[in-house]
Structure formats: C-alpha cells, structure tokens
A protein has these predicted regions:
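Inter-helical loop and helix-membrane interface segments of multi-pass membrane transporters/permeases
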Residues: 8-16, 42-47, 77-100, 113-173, ...
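Membrane-embedded translocation segments of transport machinery
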Residues: 12-17, 177, 181-325, 329, ...
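Hydrophobic core segments of alpha-helical transmembrane domains in multi-pass membrane transport
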Residues: 56-65, 102-127, 156-170, 185-198, ...
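Alpha-helical transmembrane segments and their helix-start/interface "positive-inside/aromatic belt" motifs
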Residues: 22, 49-56, 94-110, 177-187, ...
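Transmembrane alpha-helical segments of multi-pass small-molecule transport proteins
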Residues: 22-28, 98-102, 130-170, 236-243, ...
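Membrane-interface "cap" regions at the ends of multi-pass membrane proteins
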Residues: 2-38, 65-72, 76-89, 95-99, ...
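Extracellular loop-to-transmembrane helix junctions
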Residues: 15, 44-70, 152-153, 269-272
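Juxtamembrane helix-boundary/capping and inter-helix hinge elements in multi-pass membrane proteins
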Residues: 46-51, 77-81, 91-94, 247-257, ...
Length: 356
C-alpha cells in the first residue's frame, strides 16, 4: 500500500511542471551559476587540465547523478517544501534537516544576490558607459569604487532580488518554468557565439591548452577533493533546491531521464564556461585567475580591444545575469515554498517577506 503522501488524492493537491523540458531547463538553470564562468575554468586549468576534467565528469555522471536523482525523488514523494518532505518521509525529528536547508538557501541567496547585482550594474555600464572598458587600470579602479559604495551595492542588489522575486511570485508555471524556457536557450546561444569569436583570436590555443592539456604533475589529492566539491556545488544538491523543484513533478515523470539531462547540461556548461573566457584571456596574455577580477576587469578589457567590444560586453554580462538569476530563483523558491507550505503564506506575501 502506498503511503498517504503518494496517493492520487495527495498528488493532485500540488502544482506540476507543465512539461519535462520545463523542469529540465529550470533544474539546469538552478545548477548553472556564476561558478561555471568565474570559478571552474581556473580551477580546471590550475589543477592539471584534462586530468582534473576527467574525474569531475565521471563524478558528475555517477555520484552527482545519483545524489540529484535521490533528492528529486524525495521531493516528488514529499510533495511539499523541504521541511514538509523530511517530516512526511522521515518523521518529525527529520524536519530539522529541512530547516537547515531553508536557512542555507536563504544565507547563500543573501550574498549571491549581491554578486548578481554586480552583473546588472556592469550590464548597465556596458550599455550606456562603454568608454571605461578600454583601460584596464580604469576598470580596476571602477570595480574597486563600485564595491566600496554602499549605495551602488544596495541599489544593484535590490534590483537583482526584485527581478528574482517577480519570477518566483508568478509561480512555478508562469514564472520559473517560463523563465527557464526563455533564458536557458538564450544563454546557450550567447555563450556559443562568444566562444566561436574567442576561438578565432590569435594565440587562443593557449587557453585550450590550459584547459585540456594532460598535466598530472598539477593534480593531487586536494585537486580530487576540489573536483568532488565542485560536482556537488555545480549540481546544486544538498541544500534542498532540487528537492523543492522535485516536489512539483507528477508521479508519471521519468526522473532518470530528467535528472540525467540536468547533469549533462550542467557538466557541459562548466566546460563551455572555460571555453567562454580562457581562449580570449590567453590571446591577450592576461592573468587567468578566477573570481571577480576575471569577470569584471579582465574580460571587459578583452572586449574593449575590438570595435564591436560593446556588443560582446553586453552579451557577456547578459550571460552572467541569466546564469545568476536562474540559480537565485531556485534558492528563493526553496524559502518561499517553506513559508507557503509550513506557515500558510500566500505566494506573493512569501516572496515579499523573503526578499525584505
């Protein structure tokens, strides 16, 4: 006999994704974040290139897929927020793990939205003030002044979190699913366009060598741990975001196909993230170090060397924004689902409380 939370009467009480592709794109959007662009390329190149990529891909397709499948399966079984799911399946004592997941998602979103705000600010700069992009020293000074300005940071972060909240407030189908169907294909097209451009640059082969050469001397046990850690980080498993998304799946959905598709897209995006930045960075002999310097100083400087650099800069920061907001939406939905299911908030009120 099925437990009560798997019976048809219970399954019908919660909204479902309208299509498999909608869930896959939303799930991939949750997993594909800024780390694929500003963290993974440097991590892979500095830890042996292909020697690092091989265990990362293997772990993503094995351990990562198994964990994602388990989390999504639990979500579909529980048919509620992460707290609700743990309580229904494991009993009252297990609800504490759900609370920890909600707290983790909220804390991560609090600083992730700040970085997302930076992408909005730089997108606006690329659109309306492209002149500052041409000088690397000026770029560094501009970035330092920006992150040191409380007003600029608050305005940009607020803009980002408002966009995120609007998407979540519209609900699973009209908000999150629709956004994934629009933004993820656009993200892929723009990333591929920039990659094609970067591979045509002189000396771009240095970036390919940095990413894909077989360099065992740079790989050690710490590198293996980093590959494993990035596998979990890139697939967004462990905090409950995927469990929450899984709670909106119908009982007939083929989870193995959907989860395998998400893992494939996420792993591919990390590799594409390396191809997005490293060939261009090496073409100009610049420092490939990861983090904010790579995305907000080095890459804008590279784009500025071309007559159509403004177009490239706008496309690049749109890519960053799309990657950031699809991840942020999953974190906010984690919190909103908790407020709706456990505290009986309306969805829009839950979004308002979560963002404030």
């Amino acid at each position: 006999m099925l437990p009560h939370f798997l019976k048809d009467s219970f399954m019908e009480k919660r909204l479902n994704w309208k299509s498999r592709i909608g869930f896959i794109l939303a799930g991939a959007g949750a997993a594909i974040g800024l780390g694929a662009i500003w963290k993974f390329p440097f991590m892979a190149g500095s830890n042996g290139g292909a020697v690092f990529l091989f265990p990362y891909v293997v772990m993503s397709l094995t351990v990562g897929l198994a964990l994602l499948l388990a989390e999504v399966t639990l979500g579909r079984m529980g048919r509620g927020s992460v707290v609700t799911t743990f309580r229904r399946i494991g009993g009252k004592g297990w609800a504490v793990w759900g609370y920890l997941g909600v707290l983790t998602g909220f804390c991560v979103l609090s600083f992730y939205s700040a970085i997302g705000g930076w992408t909005i600010a730089y997108l606006v700069d690329a659109l309306f003030s492209p002149e500052f992009l041409s000088d690397k020293t000026q770029l560094a000074q501009h970035f330092g002044a920006f992150v040191s300005s409380p007003v600029a940071c608050i305005v940009s972060q607020t803009s980002f979190i408002v966009l995120t909240a609007v998407a979540v407030a519209f609900g699973i189908n009209k908000g999150i699913e629709r956004m994934g169907k629009i933004l993820m294909p656009l993200l892929l097209v723009m990333v591929l366009a920039i990659i094609i451009w970067s591979l045509t640059l002189p000396n771009s082969g240095g970036g390919l060598k940095y990413l894909f050469s077989w360099n065992p001397s740079a790989f050690n046990f710490q590198s293996l741990l980093m590959a494993m850690g990035f596998t979990f980080f890139s697939l967004c498993v462990g905090c409950g975001c995927m469990m929450t998304y899984g709670s909106y799946l119908g009982k007939t959905e083929d989870l193995s196909v959907s989860c395998a598709s998400i893992v494939f897209l996420t792993t591919l995006s990390s590799i594409l993230g390396g191809l997005l930045v490293m060939p261009a960075v090496f073409a100009f002999g610049l420092d490939p170090a990861s983090g904010p310097n790579l995305t907000f100083i080095t890459m804008p400087y590279v784009f500025a060397q071309f007559s159509f650099g403004q177009v490239l800069a706008v496309a690049f920061f749109l890519c960053l924004l799309f990657a950031a907001i699809t991840s942020a939406v999953s974190m906010l939905e984690l919190v909103v689902a908790f407020l709706v299911d456990e505290l009986k908030f309306g969805r829009r009120n839950a979004c308002l409380v979560s963002t404030v």
